[in-house]
Amino acid sequence: MHTQVLFEHPLNEKMRTWLRIEFLIQQLSINLPIADHAGALHFFRNISDLLDVFERGEVRTELLKELERQQRKLQAWVEVPGVDQDRIEALRQQLKSAGSVLISAPRIGQQLREDRLIALVRQRLSIPGGCCSFDLPTLHIWLHLQQAQRDAQIESWLASLNPLTQALTLVLDLIRNSAPFRKQTSLNGFYQDNGDDADLLRLMLMLDSQLYPQISGHKSRFAIRFMPLDSENGLVPERLDFELACC
């Protein structure tokens, strides 16, 4: 059992969008293979949420900008003595390759938007109980197909997201590893600091404290209020040690 809990909080809109996309893509794979109605609804609901996120912003444009920004940051390390040059070059090539694949890929989510089954299910998801067999006979018969046939279709849907997934995973890994965790101490459940143009806060808390952070702020400044899980009887210590990384 984990003794520490990791919390992440975005400090700008692009990071908020990227974390939501990452979460939804991870959710798509959790219940595979899909063999029943509950698993299917979980899968299609996450597909629908993912398409909604895609429609709200220029996901590809922002990712391409970030891939270029990360390449420039790596270039600045080339002249630093003692740096692993091979590692730097390998990362630069990965960023360059991910950018090339992403820029040449079809519109993100286009295959999913054009799929008839996905479109039919999306229309019914907002209706309470709207995915019953009499409402969605298409889904009902799909769930009675051979497992291999469903698996192949799902694999095709997920493969259409690969250019995005590859670029996003690379970018988020670099951002998450851009700053080390440092020990900090809150006083009376409160902590604040400068953001130093960070994109992401990562915070580690001991599980046995049964506390969680409420974080507000932006890239220049942020504040953290620690709250007890048990809102009635839980206590927040006068001094609380935790680990924080501003990435």
Curated annotation (Swiss-Prot):
Keywords of this entry: Cell cycle, Cell division, Cytoplasm, Septation
Pfam families documented for this protein: ZapD
Entry GO CC: cell division site; cytoplasm
Single GO BP term: division septum assembly
Cellular localisation: Cytoplasm
Matches recorded under InterPro entries: ZapD, ZapD_C, ZapD_sf
Location (main, coarse): cytoplasm
Transmembrane segments: none
Highest taxon listed in the record's lineage: Bacteria
Record HAMAP family: ZapD
Matching NCBIfam families: PRK05287.1-1 (NF003653), PRK05287.1-3 (NF003655)
Function: Cell division factor that enhances FtsZ-ring assembly. Directly interacts with FtsZ and promotes bundling of FtsZ protofilaments, with a reduction in FtsZ GTPase activity.
Family: Belongs to the ZapD family.
Quaternary structure (record): Interacts with FtsZ.
Full protein name: Cell division protein ZapD
Designated gene of the protein: zapD
